[in-house]
Amino acid sequence: MIKQQELYEAFLTRVEPEHRAFAAELHELFVNNGCTVEINPTSSGFLVSYKFASTKKAVANFVFRKSGLLLRLYADHASRDEALLSALPEDLLAAIRKAPDCKRLTRSGACNPRCAAGYEVIIRGERFQKCRYNAYLFPICMENNPFLQSIIERELTARTQAEA
């Protein structure tokens, strides 16, 4: 446990100062909602994974890139909430558009046989079939943070209710 705490503190020091409080807030949200945390050093910083403890399925990852800190969401339940997705700002919608299409959903080619299919969603009348690993890969920034937190809260609530 001490090693994980040390890794978490090292992760926070790599986060831009203006985003540390938000990263810490999300960390607490995940932990308080029954997620396990796995932190691994990478060449570009850290990969911080949050998994729903009972199902062991990933909910989110913090990922460092040259452009800064990104949050990858596995929004299996929130993806079905059309109102939530329609309220996304244009920058987040652009990130979804930019994500590669899911090869399994579009049947355009072979994907890894163990790969879970991506997300098929309709946002503002536009249909997307995106890879689950890049569909919801969003930059952490002041404009995006409230929307990211909203998606996470809905996803955690839906996963908890699905267990009940």
Predicted regions and their residues:
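Charge-dense, helix-prone N-terminal extensions
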Residues: M1-A164
